[in-house]
Amino acid sequence: MYYAGIDYHKRYSVVSIQNAQGQIVQEQRVDHAHPEGFRRLFRECPEPVSVVYESTVNWSWLYEILEPLKNVSSVTLANPFKVRLIAEAQIKTDQISARALATLLRLNVVPACHIPDQKTRRRREVLRQRSYWVKMRTAVRCRVHQILGNQRHLSG
C-alpha cells in the first residue's frame, strides 16, 4: 500500500507518495490546468494508493478526479485546523506539508472531515449561490433606499 499526501493550492498541488515503511517513492508538482497529471501519477503507482489532502474551498474538484481512479483505494479529506495542530513545523514548504500529510495517513492519525455524497454537494452549492444572490439583492435594495432617503432635501 502507498500513501499520498497532497498539499493543495489554488493553481497547483504538490504530491508526496510514501511506501508502507515511510520511504518517499515519488514527489511531483501537478498544475491544476492539467488535471490529467493526477490521473497519470496515480495510474503509474504499482500498488493501491490511499490519498489525503486538506479541506479547502475547492476540495470537491480534486475529490471528483481522484475518487473514481481504480488505483486509488481511498480519499481522505483532512480537517485543516486539527492537522495544523499535529503537523506544525518551523520550516514549512509545499513538499514538507505533503510529506507530513502522507505520514499522518500512513500512521492512521489523520483528523478526517465528512465527505457528503455528490447529490448533497450539488445541493449545497446551489443553496450557497442562492444565499449569495439573496444577500446581494438585499444589499442593493438597502443602498437604493439610502440614496433615495438622502435625496429628500431636493424635492422641496
How would you name each of these model-derived features?
Residues 1-156:
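Phosphate- and other anionic-substrate recognition elements at nucleic-acid/protein interfaces
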